[in-house]
Amino acid sequence: MSCCGGNCGCGSGCNGCGGCKMYPDLSYNESTTTETLVLGVGHEKTSFGTMEMGESPAAENGCKCGSECKCNPCACSK
């Protein structure tokens, strides 16, 4: 099982880089931006959604990423 640039290896034989995007926000982009920071007071969020134990939020084509960038199950249908 490989982990290439945040993609779990879920190709044939559980290898390659065509599987789940474990870290989709980690990409390098060079640009100039202006940021505005807004501080304020809002309502307290008491519910953070429901998620089963051991379930990963990242999934692609039936291929779910588990811990250590391993796919569970290793069966991508691309």
Curated annotation (Swiss-Prot):
The keyword Metal-binding applies. InterPro entries: Metalthion_15p. One of its GO terms (molecular function) is metal ion binding. Pfam families: Metallothio_2. Keywords: Metal-binding, Metal-thiolate cluster. Metallothioneins have a high content of cysteine residues that bind various heavy metals. Belongs to the metallothionein superfamily. Type 15 family. This is Metallothionein-like protein type 2. It comes from Nicotiana glutinosa (Tobacco).
